[in-house]
Amino acid sequence: MEKVQQTIRAPRGTELQTKGWVQEAALRMLMNNLDPEVAEKPEELVVYGGIGRAARNWESYQAIVDSLKTLESDETLLVQSGKPVAIFKSHEDAPRVLLANSNLVPKWANWDHFRELEKKGLMMYGQMTAGSWIYIGTQGILQGTYETFGEAARQHFGGSLKGTLTLTAGLGGMGGAQPLAVTMNGGVVIAIDVDKRSIDRRIEKRYCDMYTESLEEALAVANEYKEKKEPISIGLLGNAAEILPELVKRNITPDLVTDQTSAHDPLNGYIPVGYTLEEAAKLREEDPERYVQLSKESMTKHVEAMLAMQEKGAITFDYGNNIRQVAFDEGLKNAFDFPGFVPAFIRPLFCEGKGPFRWVALSGDPEDIYKTDEVILREFADNEHLCNWIRMARQQVEFQGLPSRICWLGYGERAKFGRIINEMVANGELSAPIVIGRDHLDCGSVASPNRETEAMKDGSDAVADWPILNALINSVNGASWVSVHHGGGVGMGYSLHAGMVIVADGTEAAAKRIERVLTSDPGMGVVRHVDAGYDLAVETAKEKGVNIPMMK
C-alpha cells in the first residue's frame, strides 16, 4: 500500500462542495474518517482495526471524492471494496451511496484468499465503520464498552467496579475505549499495548491516565488505587502474551479479564511474543506465513493465561476479536470456556432494539452537539442511566475530528430523536445538517457467531440473512448511504454485517426518510431476537406494535 503524507480534514460550515447536503455528508464523513485526529494510519488510508480502510487506494479515494462532488440528487454511487465502480440514475429518496466491502463467497472467505486479492488491488478490508464512512474515533465504541463493564459490575460486583482491578490489552481505535469505560464505572484498569504510540494517543485524548513500561509500577499503582477504591487507568507497554502468563506465574489474579488486541488479523493486527514493532514489520514482509504461525502461538498462550485467571476466580470474557477461535484452532480445546461479551452482558439490550446510535455535526461546531445533548437530557429524562452517560461524555470525552456523540437508543427512541434533530436543523437551532448513523455492531445488522450472534437461543448464530435484510430495508426506506461488509471485528470468514447512515438536513423529505429508516433499522433487531425466541424481544415487539407475522 502506497503511503501518502497529506492531511485530510472534512470541510466545516455551510458552504457546499457538492450538489446537495446528502452528498456533502458522505464527502465530509469519508474525509473525517481520514482526519489524523480520527484515523490510526491515515497515510495508508487505515482508519482502525488493523487494516480497516476508508478507500482501496489513493487513486480510488480521489475518484470517490470527485464522484461525490458531481453526484446529482437523483443518482447513486456504487462502491465495491473501496473503489467507485458506477453511478446510476435512481431517485431522490434512494441512497446516494451503496457500498459493499470485503465480501467473499463463503468457500473462499479466508485471510489467504483475501490477501491474494488485496495484493492484486482487487479488494480492501472495510472493518465495520472504516469502509462505511461513519467512524468517529474511540468515542464510537465508548458507550458500548461502558455498558459492557457496567453490566459486568451489576452482575458480579454489586453495581460498581470500585475496588476492582480489570486487566485487558489492545489500545487501538476500538480497544482504546476500555480504560475510560472502566474508570467511568469506578474501577482500576491495567491496559497493555505493544505500541507506545497507541498508549500515548489514548493519554493525549484523556482515555487513559498514565503510562508505564514497568509491570511492577503498574501493579503498585493499581493496588494503591484499588485499596483506596478510586479509579485510575494505567497504560502498560508490553506484550499481553508475555505479561498475562507472568501474572499467572506470580499468582496475581485480577477481578476482571478481557482483551481487545487486533487478534482478528494474525498478520497485520497481532504482534508475536519476543518481537519489537520494527522486527515484527520486517518478519511480516519477509516471511508472512511464519509471522502468522508465531502470532497464533502467542494468541494461544494469551488465551491459556486468561483461562488460568478464570479458574482462579477472575470474571473473564472475550471482547469480540476472535482470539478464542484462533486458540481453539491451534489445539486449545477449552478456549471457549469463557463467554463472549454479547451473550454475557449485551444481548438484553439488543432484544429491546438498543444499540450504538451516533450523530455528527457537519458544521464542525461543538455547540451543535451540546444542544443535542440537551435534547437527550430533556426528552429521555426518565432514563437516568442514559442521562448519566450523556453528562459523563460531555465532561470526559474529547471530540476527534467533526464533533459527535454516541448513545445507545432503542426502538422508538431513535426515530423520536431523529425527528427532533431534523426539526432543529429546519428551524435554525443547529447551524448545519446532522449525520445520524451507527456501528455495524447493532441489534439487527450483524451475523457473527463468535461475537454479536454467539450462543443464540435457537442455535441460529451463523444465519446471515439478517444483515442482508437489514441493508435491503434501509435502502428502500431511504437511508443516505448503506453498506454491506464481511469480516469486521472477527476477521475473514466469521461475520457479515450492514451499516446505514441518514442525514437530517431539515427538509420534509428528510423527516419522512428518518421516520422510516430509524424505525425499520432497530426494528430489525427486535425482529431478529423475536425469531430466535427471546421473551424480552417478544414483549418489546408487542408493546411497540412491531408487525411480525408468525410471532406467538
Swiss-Prot record:
Its EC number is 4.2.1.49. InterPro entries: Urocanase, Urocanase-like, Urocanase_C, Urocanase_central_sf, Urocanase_CS, Urocanase_N, Urocanase_Rossmann-like, Urocanase_sf. GO terms for cellular component: cytoplasm. Keywords: Cytoplasm, Histidine metabolism, Lyase, NAD. Pathway: Amino-acid degradation; L-histidine degradation into L-glutamate; N-formimidoyl-L-glutamate from L-histidine: step 2/3. One of its GO terms (biological process) is L-histidine catabolic process to glutamate and formamide. GO terms for molecular function: urocanate hydratase activity. It catalyses: 4-imidazolone-5-propanoate = trans-urocanate + H2O. Its main location: cytoplasm. Binds 1 NAD(+) per subunit. The active site is at C407. NAD(+) binds at residues 49-50, 127, 173-175, 193, 239-240, 260-264, 270-271, 319, 489. Belongs to the urocanase family. This is Urocanate hydratase. It comes from Bacillus thuringiensis (strain Al Hakam). The gene is hutU.
